[in-house]
């Protein structure tokens, strides 16, 4: 089905958008950090920027890039999906981007954090950094990327938190739609599915 590749990342952002809206906030003008640079991360970053956010940092297993003007999603997709290269290559090809080898993306100042890389990537110490830097929203794009200690910090510091069981269910919802389409021998457009 269309949107299968994008579904989990898009869904994470749509869930976060609803969470933000409940508190009179929105993505428009927000600074966002996204850990990871696989499908979930890339498409979460893409959708956040489509909604008016600036994705100021993204990571891979070697480090992270920081880009105050926002990530160039098309170049990032070319580097990660076509060339299968590293974020350090993205930094080399883009003006105004700094690469932090082995750095901790959670030290970057942002309004929204979307951990989309791997399990237990965001611990209590990282959660404190996010809180100290003014982060207000965290939504799990990956499966269980936040440790229990991190979640406790979010609770104590009044950071709105969306667990992956809810926030990253866009892929599951799209799979259900795909099964329905297959059963009825029907198809939906990209825009409808999005």
Question: What are the residue ranges of the model-derived segments?
Answer:
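Glycine-rich phosphate/diphosphate-binding loop of Rossmann-like nucleotide-binding domains
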Residues: 3-109
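Glycine- and acidic
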Residues: 1-4, 134-135
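Conserved helix-loop functional segments at active or binding sites
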Residues: 17-22, 119, 128, 144
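Short glycine/serine/threonine-rich phosphate/pyrophosphate-binding segments
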Residues: 40-44, 121-125, 146-148, 169-172
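Rossmann-fold NAD(P) dinucleotide-binding segment
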Residues: 100-110, 120-137
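A general structural motif
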Residues: 94-97, 114-122, 142-146
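Adenosine-phosphate binding glycine-rich loop
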Residues: 20, 131-194
């Amino acid at each position: 089905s269309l949107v299968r590749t994008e579904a989990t990342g898009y869904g994470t952002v749509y869930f976060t958008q609803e969470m933000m809206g409940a508190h009179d906030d929105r993505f428009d003008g927000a600074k966002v950090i996204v850990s990871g640079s696989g499908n979930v991360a890339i498409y979460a970053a893409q959708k956040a920027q489509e909604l008016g956010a600036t994705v100021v940092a993204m990571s891979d297993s070697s480090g992270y890039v920081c880009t105050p003007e926002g990530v160039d999603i098309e170049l990032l997709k070319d580097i990660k999906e076509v060339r299968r290269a590293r974020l350090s290559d993205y930094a080399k090809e883009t003006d105004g981007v700094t690469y932090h080898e082995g750095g901790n993306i959670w030290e970057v100042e942002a309004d929204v954090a979307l951990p989309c890389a791997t399990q237990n990537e965001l611990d209590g110490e990282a959660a404190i950094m996010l809180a100290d830097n003014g982060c207000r929203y965290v939504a799990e794009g990956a499966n269980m990327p936040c440790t229990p200690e991190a979640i406790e910090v979010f609770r104590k510091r009044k950071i709105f938190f969306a667990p992956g069981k809810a926030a990253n269910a866009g892929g599951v919802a799209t799979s259900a739609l795909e099964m329905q389409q297959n059963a009825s021998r029907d198809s939906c457009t990209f825009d409808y599915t999005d």
